Curated annotation (Swiss-Prot):
Signal peptide: none annotated. The lineage of its organism: Bacteria, Pseudomonadati, Pseudomonadota, Gammaproteobacteria, Alteromonadales. This is Protein Syd. Belongs to the Syd family. It is found in: Cell inner membrane. It comes from the Bacteria. The keyword Cell inner membrane applies. GO terms for cellular component: cytoplasmic side of plasma membrane.
Length: 183
């Protein structure tokens, strides 16, 4: 059985092999290590690279008085990359990634808002890791207690469990080959 790190690395390898030219949003101020050729003011080619230091959740955990499931910290603390367009059982998913340390801080701010919303709604705490491409309101989330990967609508509870673990879910995701940068 693969570790989560091995599953993440294997997915990144499949992605690089199957999507030889990758595009992402260009944020000039970030000076991201993934950036390659700048296509235009909003678009850049990218190549994934390992984070020199994993995204640190300690301050957020302290502020929210909670611990995040280890799979969440591992997913967002391993690679810098553009978001990954994936196919999961015939459904296109955008798996969120961080492009740089600055983007990681932005992600932590967004996670904070999501957790506070869940608490206000008295729902189990989840962390979003992706979006359903068919509908922006459909989130791919990790249940913070169990680590299960599932689907939920914004503001609702997880309604469909896709996998009991992130590693198993990632092993079943395949790169979605895009035909051009505007796909």
């Amino acid at each position: 059985m693969k570790t989560l790190e091995e599953s993440i690395d294997a997915l990144m390898t499949r992605y690089k092999e199957n999507v030889p030219v990758r595009y992402t949003e260009y944020v000039e101020e970030w000076n991201s290590p993934i950036y390659g050729t700048v296509i235009d003011e909003n678009t850049v080619e990218w190549t994934p690279c390992r984070q020199p230091e994993a995204l640190n959740f300690d301050d957020l955990e302290s502020a929210l008085e909670m611990s995040f499931h280890q799979s969440i910290k591992t997913l967002f603390g391993r690679w810098y990359a553009g978001d990954l367009a994936l196919d999961y059982q015939g459904h296109t998913i955008s798996l969120l990634q961080t492009q740089s340390a600055e983007d990681g801080e932005r992600l932590l701010e967004n996670i904070t808002g999501h957790i506070l919303m869940k608490r206000r709604l008295k729902q189990p705490e989840t962390v979003f890791i992706g979006l359903g491409s068919e509908d922006d309101g459909l989130l791919v989330t990790i249940d913070n207690q169990s680590g299960a990967v599932g689907l939920e609508w914004v503001g609702k509870e997880q309604h469909d469990v896709l996998s009991d673990s992130l590693a198993a879910w990632l092993d079943n995701c395949q790169p979605q080959v895009e035909t051009d940068k505007n796909s």
